[in-house]
């Protein structure tokens, strides 16, 4: 029997929900109330994100189920010297029931970071920038405690009711500025951006005692992501002993140069070399598309200077709808002769 069901209600799931049901509930609720949507509600979105952050952590979920939201926020209940009830029992006497130690106040930025990591850094709906969400425009949260008053519950020195020995007020945590964001360029091939490949690699970072350590980072690329797309991982960089937190890592997609294709938005450009003869009499060739298929190209008429041919649906996937693709644009590069002999000149003169 859980103490309260508020967080489960925010995600639209039952207290017995498993991990997949929690993720499904968060996805539906977060998309509905995201501030960029017409149905958006910033405060509701923050509550939904905090609910998922707590319930998706087995330890925090256990604390929430047993003691409630404030306990989950602060990491668990604390008791006086006499334990629960203490030597003098509960209810305003020495050694009575303890309160909760203070924890990090869940902020708007925390909400957007959770959303970004859940969806891999890209926008899951139209109207947002292809490079993902920018969190710098959203203010950080952080209230003084329940009721907005210093000292937490009741806002009075003695806790609830202001009586010594009763419930102690929530202790306030020191407020630190947001951890530094370290950007790391991530070179990716067009083929990997086409299919949306998973990239896994190990990074070195400083641990709590200054020693070097390694951790694995997994990035699930989304089909059609472009250069400049940012994927943010909070609390994954070097450890900061002053705050007890880690720096934020932000990976920036960089497109590797391709031997055959040049990208222009969702379109791919292929330059096809032609001899002077082929440019006049026509040609029949094949090229390999970005997804490995063979595409036949042919013409029976002369190729005009700066002429191109467009093949719809043969380019890169569009990030907002990967089932749709841009175009393949073929440009022709004619190898014009540097010089002509007399016979060639006569042939041109007699026929043109």
UniProtKB/Swiss-Prot annotation:
- InterPro entries for this protein: DnaJ_C, DnaJ_domain, DnaJ_domain_CS, DnaJ_subfamily_B, HSP40/DnaJ_pept-bd, J_dom_sf
Q: For bias kind Polar residues, which ranges apply?
A: 301-312
The keyword Phosphoprotein is annotated on this UniProt entry: yes
Q: Which residues carry this modification: Phosphoserine?
A: 275
**Record GO terms (molecular function):** DNA binding; misfolded protein binding; protein-folding chaperone binding; unfolded protein binding
Q: Indicate the segments forming the J domain, all copies.
A: 4-70
Presence of the UniProt keyword Phosphoprotein in the record: yes
* Any one biological process term the GO annotation gives: chaperone cofactor-dependent protein refolding
Region (Disordered) residue spans? 300-325
Enumerate the subcellular locations listed in this protein's record, separating them with semicolons.
Cytoplasm; Nucleus
Instruction: Keywords in alphabetical order, please.
Output: Cell cycle, Chaperone, Cytoplasm, DNA-binding, Nucleus, Phosphoprotein
List cellular component terms (GO). cytosol; cytosolic small ribosomal subunit; nucleolus; nucleus
Q: Any other noteworthy remark?
A: Present with 20300 molecules/cell in log phase SD medium.
> What is this protein's function?
Required for nuclear migration during mitosis. It is required for the normal initiation of translation. Might mediate the dissociation of a specific protein complex of the translation machinery. Essential for viability.
- Self-association and partners: Interacts with polyadenylate-binding protein PAB1.
Name of protein: Protein SIS1
Q: Which organism is it from?
A: Saccharomyces cerevisiae (strain ATCC 204508 / S288c)
Gene this chain is encoded by: SIS1
């Amino acid at each position: 029997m859980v103490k309260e069901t508020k967080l489960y209600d925010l995600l639209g799931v039952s207290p017995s929900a498993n991990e997949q049901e929690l993720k499904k509930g968060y996805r539906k609720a977060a998309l509905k109330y995201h501030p960029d949507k017409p149905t958006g509600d910033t405060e509701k979105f923050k509550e939904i994100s905090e609910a998922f952050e707590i319930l998706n952590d087995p330890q925090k979920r256990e604390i929430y189920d047993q003691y409630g939201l404030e306990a989950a926020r602060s990491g668990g209940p604390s008791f006086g010297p006499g334990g629960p009830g203490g030597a003098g029992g509960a209810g305003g006497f020495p050694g009575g029931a303890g309160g909760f130690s203070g924890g990090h106040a869940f902020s708007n930025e925390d909400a957007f970071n959770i959303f970004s990591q859940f969806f891999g850094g890209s926008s899951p709906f139209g109207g947002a920038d292809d490079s993902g969400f920018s969190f710098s425009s959203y203010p950080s949260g952080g209230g003084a405690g329940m009721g907005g008053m210093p000292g937490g519950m009741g806002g009075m020195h003695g806790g609830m009711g202001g009586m010594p020995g009763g419930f102690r007020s929530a202790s306030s945590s020191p407020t630190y500025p947001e951890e530094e964001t370290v950007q790391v360029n991530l070179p990716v091939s067009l083929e990997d951006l086409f299919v949306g490949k998973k990239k896994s690699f190990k990074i070195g970072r400083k641990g709590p005692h200054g020693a070097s350590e390694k951790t694995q980072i997994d990035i699930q690329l989304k089909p059609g992501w472009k250069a400049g797309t940012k994927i943010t991982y909070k609390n994954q960089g070097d450890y900061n002993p002053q705050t007890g937190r880690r720096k934020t890592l932000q990976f920036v997609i960089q497109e590797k140069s391709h031997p055959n294709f040049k990208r222009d938005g969702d379109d791919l450009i292929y330059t096809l070399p032609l001899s002077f003869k082929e440019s006049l009499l026509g040609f029949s060739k094949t090229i390999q598309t970005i997804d490995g298929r063979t595409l036949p190209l042919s013409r029976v008429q002369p190729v005009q200077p700066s002429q191109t041919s467009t093949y719809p649906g043969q380019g890169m996937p569009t990030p907002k709808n990967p089932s749709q693709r841009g175009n393949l644009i073929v440009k022709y590069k004619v190898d014009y002769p540097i010089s002509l002999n007399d016979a060639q000149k006569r042939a041109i003169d007699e026929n043109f």
